[in-house]
């Protein structure tokens, strides 16, 4: 069974259609990234996946035993005294083993904030703490809504590498919403382009050439993603498989820096 499977999901709010017949599957060790314009229903889709919103139609099956969630942001009232240590400890049912909080914060590059109050954290520090909190649960599925918001560029690369490592090295399934299209195209296994319905989905290279993707993001964005095209005698199927040109692999293409396949 997949870690997460959505089939034919429809959702309305206030008489407006938010999601229309959305299908999505997340398997162990796979990174699925949802992209789309503002108002496309991306965050709502994650909330349906988590069970925070009930769809009007369709099915949601969760095979994951433990889910780690990083929201787009979390606002904690300034009058609430809550230390980072306590905030992290609340994520797990039992008291964490000695040193585990420190290790997890160090992993996300935020070891220096353990003794501080949550309300005193910067936006980037808070996102790192939220990711640490999700990882403390030892999840088999990570659900991430813009996980690097407010983090500087160098820090973004570090956190995306960490997320990728969770999938590749530990078999964690990842469902992520991101506006960082360059990173998405480099690191993800499967892209879902959402605009209330699924406009297109598949391997990043395939999606980046799809007419509906181009219509949503424009040719300038598509041109800026040329770094992810390659100059070999093969192309890719929708699932990312390597195809000779004679089998529908498309035109010859060239690899850019950071490309992870040949």
Curated annotation (Swiss-Prot):
Task: Give the location in the cell.
Answer: Cell inner membrane
- Region (Disordered), start-end ranges: 238-262
Major localization listed first in the record, in broad terms: membrane
Output the InterPro entries linked to this UniProt entry.
Answer: AAA+_ATPase, ABC_transporter-like_ATP-bd, ABC_transporter-like_CS, Metal_Ion_Import_ABC, P-loop_NTPase
Catalytically driven reaction(s):
Zn(2+)(out) + ATP(in) + H2O(in) = Zn(2+)(in) + ADP(in) + phosphate(in) + H(+)(in)
Domain of life the protein comes from: Bacteria
Top-level class of the enzyme under EC nomenclature: translocase
Q: How does it sit in the membrane?
A: Peripheral membrane protein
Q: Which UniProt keywords apply?
A: ATP-binding, Cell inner membrane, Cell membrane, Ion transport, Membrane, Nucleotide-binding, Translocase, Transport, Zinc, Zinc transport
What Pfam families does this protein map onto? ABC_tran
| Intrachain S-S bonds | none
Q: Name one GO molecular function term.
A: ABC-type zinc transporter activity
The EC code for this enzyme is: 7.2.2.20
GO terms (BP aspect) = response to zinc ion
Question: Which residues bind ATP per the record?
Answer: 36-43
A GO cellular component annotated for this chain's UniProt record is: plasma membrane
* Positions of the ABC transporter domain: 4-220
- Relate the protein's function as given in its record: Part of the ABC transporter complex ZnuABC involved in zinc import. Responsible for energy coupling to the transport system.
Q: How the protein assembles, per its UniProt entry?
A: The complex is composed of two ATP-binding proteins (ZnuC), two transmembrane proteins (ZnuB) and a solute-binding protein (ZnuA).
Which PANTHER family does the entry mention? METAL TRANSPORT SYSTEM ATP-BINDING PROTEIN TM_0124-RELATED (PTHR42734), ZINC IMPORT ATP-BINDING PROTEIN ZNUC (PTHR42734:SF9)
Q: Which family does it belong to?
A: Belongs to the ABC transporter superfamily. Zinc importer (TC 3.A.1.15.5) family.
UniProt name for this protein: Zinc import ATP-binding protein ZnuC
What species is this protein from?
Paramagnetospirillum magneticum (strain ATCC 700264 / AMB-1)
Gene, per the UniProt record: znuC
């Amino acid at each position: 069974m997949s870690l997460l499977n959505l089939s034919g999901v429809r959702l309305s709010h206030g008489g407006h259609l938010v999601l229309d017949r959305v299908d999505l599957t997340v398997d162990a060790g796979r990174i699925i990234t949802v992209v789309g314009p503002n108002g496309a229903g991306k965050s709502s889709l994650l909330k349906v996946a988590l069970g925070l919103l009930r769809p009007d139609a369709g099915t949601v099956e969760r095979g994951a035993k433990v889910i780690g969630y990083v929201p787009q942001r979390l606002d904690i009232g300034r009058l609430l005294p809550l230390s980072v240590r306590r905030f992290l400890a609340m994520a797990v049912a039992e008291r964490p083993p000695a040193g585990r909080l420190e290790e997890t914060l160090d992993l996300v590059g935020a070891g220096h904030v353990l003794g501080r109050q949550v309300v005193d954290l910067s936006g980037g520090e808070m996102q790192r703490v939220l990711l640490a909190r999700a990882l403390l649960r030892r999840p088999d599925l990570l659900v991430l809504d813009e996980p690097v918001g407010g983090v500087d560029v160098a820090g973004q690369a570090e956190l995306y590498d960490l997320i990728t490592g969770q999938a590749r090295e530990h078999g964690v399934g990842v469902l992520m919403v991101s506006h960082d299209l360059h990173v998405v195209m480099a690191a993800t296994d499967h892209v879902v382009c959402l605009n209330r319905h699924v406009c297109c989905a598949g391997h990043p290279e395939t999606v980046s050439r799809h007419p509906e993707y181009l219509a949503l993001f424009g040719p300038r964005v598509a041109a800026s993603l040329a770094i992810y095209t390659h100059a070999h005698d093969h192309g890719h199927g929708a699932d990312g498989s390597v195809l000779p040109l004679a089998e529908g692999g498309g035109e010859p293409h060239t690899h850019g820096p950071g490309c992870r396949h040949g």
